Design a protein with these regions (language model features):
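Helix-loop-beta segment of a Rossmann-like dinucleotide-binding subdomain
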Residues: 79-83, 116-143, 209-213
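Residues forming the flavin
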Residues: 1-71, 134-262
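N-terminal flexible segment immediately upstream of the FAD-binding catalytic core
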Residues: 2-4, 12, 69, 73, ...
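Rossmann-like flavin
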Residues: 76-118
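Beta1-alpha1 glycine-rich phosphate/pyrophosphate-binding loop at the start
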Residues: 30, 54, 103-129, 133
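Short, charged low-complexity intrinsically disordered segments located at boundaries
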Residues: 86-88, 98-105, 127-132, 172-177, ...
Length: 262
């Protein structure tokens, strides 16, 4: 993965809303060139990334190929998968896994495996292509990236800061093309809403699983970023596609507990 960017942005920080795998990855990429503020709605341990267990896919083995991965993805998606997106992910998957290794993620090793990693096979995959850290892959990835972000002088992480809405030209009543100037965020410990000006705002807020009664998602997965984007005038699509993990431990008085297929 490239560690350089050319966004042609005005001076100032980038605000990343979300401190999971997506948010921390983009923060680490951007921090080489400009200050980055990362907002975490709750405690950092509440990220859905840290809850993920099974592993991460990469076309790594000599018995694997881009075409095989794309074909498996399309079959698992019952033929309604966007092929361009599936192919892009498959083509960049090995580089993404290598970037995570370089970032310090402690995947389960196999001296004979590609990149020295142990690969496993899960449902829908024709070959072994799942790099994992035992059965706590999300936690291992999140811990490694969070450690790098915390030690980076250009990254500021604000825990328990909940993004309320984007600051747009509509809020400022400016007669111009739609533009985002920053974010309104609630400092949950102090009970104050702060306005953060930004050269750009990245929405990395995860999914919407917690709007349903039964889900394996953490309480933070309430679709905040999707709602903010929609209010700002962005096009929102494919909202009918919601991931439900097929196996959970159910208790009527407690959160559902994901049972990994790994």
């Amino acid at each position: 993965m490239s560690t350089t960017t050319d966004l042609s942005l005005p001076p100032g920080p980038v605000v990343v809303i979300g401190a999971g795998l997506a948010g921390l990855t983009v923060a680490l990429q951007l921090a080489a060139e400009r200050p980055v503020i990362v907002l975490a709605k709750r405690e950092l341990s509440e990220s859905a990334t840290a809850w993920a267990q099974g592993g991460i896919v990469g076309v790594l083995g000599s018995d694997d190929s881009i075409e095989s991965h794309v074909r498996d993805t399309q079959e698992a998606g019952a033929g309604i998968v966007d092929e361009h997106t599936a192919r892009y992910i498959a083509e960049h998957s090995a580089a993404a896994v290598q970037w995570l290794v370089d970032a310090g993620v402690s995947f389960s090793p196999d001296p004979q495996g590609p990149l020295g990693l142990h690969l496993t096979r899960e449902g829908g995959h024709a070959v072994r292509r799942i790099a994992h850290a035992a059965d706590a892959t999300g936690r291992a990835i999140h811990d490694a990236l969070l450690a790098r972000a915390r030690e980076h002088s250009n990254i500021s992480i604000r825990e328990r800061w909940m993004a309320v809405d984007l600051v747009t030209s509509r809020h400022l009543k400016r007669e111009e093309s739609p533009h985002c100037y920053g974010v309104y965020a609630l400092d949950m410990d102090r009970g104050h809403v702060q306005t953060l000006a930004a050269a750009a705002v990245v929405l990395a807020t995860g999914g919407v699983g917690k709007v349903y009664r039964y889900t394996s998602n953490p309480d933070t997965a309430t679709g905040d970023g999707i709602a903010m984007a929609w209010r700002a005038g962005c096009r929102v699509g494919n909202m009918e596609f919601i991931q439900f993990h097929p196996t959970c431990l159910y208790h009527p008085q407690e959160r559902s507990l994901l049972i990994t297929e790994a």
